[in-house]
Amino acid sequence: MFPLTRPFRQGLATAALVMFTIMPTALVAMYAWRINRPGHIRDVEIELGRQLGLQVTLEAVRYPRPGELVYQGIVLRQEEPRGKGLIEIARAGLVRLVRGDRELTLHAENLKLSGESPRQALAQVGSLLQRSGLLPLDRINLAAPACELDLGHEGLRYAIGDLAGEFIADPANPTLRVAYRLAEPGSATRCELTLNRDRAANPVRSSLVLKTLEGLPLPARVLDVFFETADWLGQRAKVEGTLALSQAGGGDWDADFQGNLIDVDLATLVGKRFPHHQLSGTARIAVQRARWGERSSQQAGWREARGELSASQGTIGVDLLQALAREMKFRLSPRISRLDPRKTEVEFRSLGLAFHMQPSGEIHLAGALGNEFSPDTVLVNATAPLAFAPSGTASVHGLIKTLFPVADSPPGVMVPLTPQSRLLLCLPVAPEIAAKSGRTLGGN
């Protein structure tokens, strides 16, 4: 064995002491100085901002243990699409990050997500998806016990609980999946959101799917991002089902809905929008499919709607019954013609109507009252039928004339252009009818 001299052994001992005690201590001291110096938080903000493509501000950064970071008071801001300034899109009181093998897990507290409008919020998320290919990660997991979602309007603020999500950073098809509970009064429904961007398609295609999974139906105000539900469906209306949105390139979003609208107030749906007519009661609308999107020779609107409307115990105006018979070929029971002329409305026990509005503007109608009545019966009182579906097809043109009687319009005007009648521009009609309607509405 090679003999070691005393000086050599002393040198080895000194080197080992430096390597295993002094150097680690120096490295720890240097690391502690670096993360505690005044400029460290700013360095972290810049690095995070570079990775996310956002402006990041922090109140504090902590390192509880190796592989774990804690950001306090984090705020994310994004440049406006027109480049006029920065807008806040997210903030959290505390975010705890745990790193794994190309995986990141985030636990957020006091989380708030913001957008100036639903459309802008979608644009913000789309911008983040575009940059996802630059992330050095395959998966990001997110958990938050509570979250506030603010889409820029008093009626578009939602409280969300038990949020759990994952982002798959697939270069060809980045996908975000989120499960959550909408914390609305009287509702604890579990919901799911899936957002992806198919970069392999030409043009690039984005899709967003929202669905209810279990629990009671949601308050219909969750649809306020699309229309004012209280003004259309009533304050007590609820919704359940699946809403799928899709966008090709930079075009407008198409929509496809399947589900149920529950506790719809018919007085709000009809009487408030079409003051010439009366209809009351509480209805359920089972939507097999309703599609919204771009249409040839027409602006964006409804392309198709199929489902069933059912209601029990309500009233219907005699004028509305007569207009349905005159313009849409509904068949009325002889007892309607024998009503007292002074009577303006008729009580009904049940209303059941199956409908299919096609892209051509044709409407196929049938009864939906079950086996107790004939397949074409749509309205009954306590003892007998009151109205039957048309023998053939009806049309959106006839529906327009039913809702807005021509006799009430000025001479030469098919339908007066009002806030109520603008919805007609969203209905599918035959091209020749669309051209005539467009001139009439546009000329007012």
Features from the language model and the residues they span:
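N-terminal type II signal-anchor transmembrane helix
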Residues: 1-51
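A short, amphipathic edge element
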Residues: 50-59
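Flexible beta-edge/linker motif
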Residues: 62-147
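Small-residue helix/turn framework positions
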Residues: 68, 73-75, 110-114, 141, ...
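Short acidic, Gly/Pro-enriched loop/turn segments at secondary-structure junctions
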Residues: 100-104, 118-121, 150-158, 295-301
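Short, solvent-exposed loop/hinge segments that bridge or flank secondary-structure elements
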Residues: 148-171, 302, 321, 328-330
